[in-house]
């Protein structure tokens, strides 16, 4: 996971994000960085525990939103798609889960999961339920999956899908590697459209 997924318990903050940390020994640096991560986790749970509605039956959010059982039930969420390597299902007896174990790094291949994630979202909707797609912060990995879903299901361009998601969840910001994978998806969809237009 990268520092893009702020607050991630397993992400390592760069020294530059904590002014003056260079003067401490490695053990103290690690302790300070761990404390900063704990504070960020607590802030995420406090401030971001309600998912964002992207479209009918599709929500996007953070780990805190995925833990908020009462809100999820009130939104008719029946399925939860977790896009993170270190997060376990919070309520395995209450929701249908799919976990895609990936880290938020530019070299992570998230594109290989696009089709199965789209199928999972479609299945939840077919059954009359709703699905929450989340990672740790609901900023990069989960956003990438939701953008890919909108592109594949509605024929949106990358720009249209990303703008729509950002209008519903302003923190949305896939890492550069995920943007490249979405650009590849867009190109493959354009080639497919050209092929079938003959």
Curated annotation (Swiss-Prot):
Gene Ontology annotations of biological process type: protein dephosphorylation
Tissue and organ expression note: Expressed in roots, stems, leaves and flowers.
Chief subcellular location: nucleus
Keywords attached to this entry: Calmodulin-binding, Cytoplasm, Hydrolase, Nucleus, Protein phosphatase
Activity regulation statement: Inhibited by sodium vanadate and sodium tungstate. NaF and spermifine repress specifically phosphoserine and phosphothreonine phosphatase activity.
Catalytic reactions of this protein: O-phospho-L-tyrosyl-[protein] + H2O = L-tyrosyl-[protein] + phosphate; O-phospho-L-seryl-[protein] + H2O = L-seryl-[protein] + phosphate; O-phospho-L-threonyl-[protein] + H2O = L-threonyl-[protein] + phosphate
Family: Belongs to the protein-tyrosine phosphatase family. Non-receptor class dual specificity subfamily.
Name of the molecule in the record: Dual specificity protein phosphatase 1
UniProt source species: Arabidopsis thaliana
Species lineage: Eukaryota, Viridiplantae, Streptophyta, Embryophyta, Tracheophyta
């Amino acid at each position: 996971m990268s520092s893009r997924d702020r607050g991630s318990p397993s992400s390592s903050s760069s020294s530059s994000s904590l002014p003056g940390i260079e003067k401490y020994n490695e053990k103290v640096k690690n302790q300070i960085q761990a404390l900063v991560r704990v504070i960020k986790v607590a802030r995420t749970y406090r401030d971001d525990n309600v998912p964002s509605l992207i479209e009918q039956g599709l929500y996007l959010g953070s780990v805190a939103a995925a833990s908020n059982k009462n809100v999820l039930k009130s939104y008719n969420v029946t399925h939860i798609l977790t896009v993170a390597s270190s997060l376990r299902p919070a309520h395995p007896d209450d929701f249908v889960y799919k976990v895609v174990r990936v880290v938020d790094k530019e070299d992570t291949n998230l594109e290989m999961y696009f089709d199965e994630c789209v199928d999972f979202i479609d299945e939840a909707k077919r059954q009359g339920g709703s699905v929450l797609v989340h990672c740790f912060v609901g900023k990069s990995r989960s956003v990438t999956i939701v953008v890919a879903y909108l592109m594949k299901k509605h024929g949106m361009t990358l720009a249209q899908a990303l703008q729509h998601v950002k209008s519903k969840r302003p923190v949305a910001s896939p890492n550069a590697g995920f943007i490249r994978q979405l650009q590849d998806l867009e190109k493959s969809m354009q080639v497919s459209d050209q092929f079938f237009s003959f």
